[in-house]
Amino acid sequence: MKFLLDHDVPEDLSYLLEQLGHDVILLRKALAEDASDEEVLQFAHERGCVLLTCNRDDFLHLATKQLHHGIVIVIRRRTRAAERAALFRLLEGAGETGLQNNINFA
């Protein structure tokens, strides 16, 4: 599966995804920092990526208006280890079909 990590997602989550065999694009290496949320979601959609973001409010709203391949809202936790564990549990439980074209929380 392919993932696009938004600017606000801790980069160490990319290492977990890569270790699990997923392709990862870091938004900060692909688009300007001032890219709009609409541009980010379109970029992910055009590349067949599930978007990982901490920006819940804006992307929940956009998901009702724009096509997407899936959005994972990363909930900030006390530690990075807890964030990695939550994402791992989501990936294990949802699988590819549960993530694609859906909105999930990790």
Predicted feature locations:
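Acidic, PIN/NYN-like endoribonuclease modules and their adjacent C-terminal/linker elements
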Residues: K2, D6-H7, E11, Y15-L20, ...
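Short active-site oxyanion
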Residues: M1-F3, H45-V50
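A short beta-strand-loop structural module common to alpha/beta enzyme folds
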Residues: D23-L31
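Acidic, metal-binding active-site segment of PIN/NYN-like and related structure-specific nucleases
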Residues: D37, G48-H61
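Short, conserved beta-strand segments within well-ordered enzyme catalytic domains
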Residues: I25, V50-T53, I73
